[in-house]
Amino acid sequence: LGIELGSTRIKAVAIDDNHQPVYSGDYTWAADFKDGIWTYDLNEAWLGLKTALKSVGNCAKVRAIGISAMMHGYLAFDKDWNLLVPFRTWQNTITAEASTELTDLFGFNIPQRWSIAHLYQAVLNNEEHINRIAHITTLAGYIHWQITGQKVLGVGDASGMIPVDSNTKTYNAEMVEKFNRLISTKGFGWTLLDILPKSLSAGENAGFLTPEGAKKLDVSGHLKAGIPVCPPEGDAGTGMVATNAVKQRTGNVSAGTSSFSMIVLEKDLSKPYEMIDMVTTPDGSLVAMVHCNNCTSDLNAWVNLFKEYQELLGIPVDMNEVYGKLYNNALKGNPDCGGLISYN
């Protein structure tokens, strides 16, 4: 059973022993812009998971589970795992000061959407919650903790929080130390490794579904505790696996709410580049990522307009069919798309 919490849909897909899809379900959601922040309600995440899983069929047959979700952003919790501030997603561009300072400090490009940039920006802003932080993680890491009790993260997702050393497959020790020195005069009751999830590579033991976790996912009661759950990953990692592009000198392009290319490198870059984000594959190999915040948002708005028009005419709407026909018809268009461009 694979579950992904994307920026526009929460998906659940079950495959058989021959890797063929047998059941699928989804739930549509969207980020809210509240008080200058792009955010999602975590309660809606659980509603979406339950809704998507209703269509999966007999969950009693599930033998393994994987969670993935949108990467980066800022989810900060206290010692009892109470959310300290609303989820700040990867869509926010509110950490320019922190991003610039950390890039200079590390000698490594730190994009605004990365978790470490959000954390340090909160420090620079003297936000009240900072001293109460006990855990920070990604959306996949949060869901995984809730269903297994394990505070872990797949190395690919972890590399979008703070830089990862591709040799050790965990957080870059030198950069962790530099950050700790940077905040040492603040008197916080934590250091960086105290609050980060443990980084795991693909295939490592990331825990098992708990009875409480099974209830959170499946209202039918068919999903049983004890199912192994793989290290939670980011949506970029699942994209690399799905396109069979995890080996060095391979790559893929993702076209979703955001667009990005992922190129698996055979050696380090010679220097940092502002437009290239260094992350990893789910097994820890270096990846050069070029990311644009907007891709299908304009298209989705047009498709929803078509959907409303069909509904006004009383015509049943299957969104998968609408997108399928639109994409296939687009192949007949001019190579330059009629001279139109959607600005990022």
Q: Which residue stretches match the model-derived regions?
A:
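Short, basic and Ser/Thr-rich N-terminal targeting/leader segments
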Residues: 6-9, 61-63, 68-70, 115, ...
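Short, acidic/turn-prone active-site loops that include or flank metal/cofactor-
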Residues: 27, 88-95, 158, 257-259
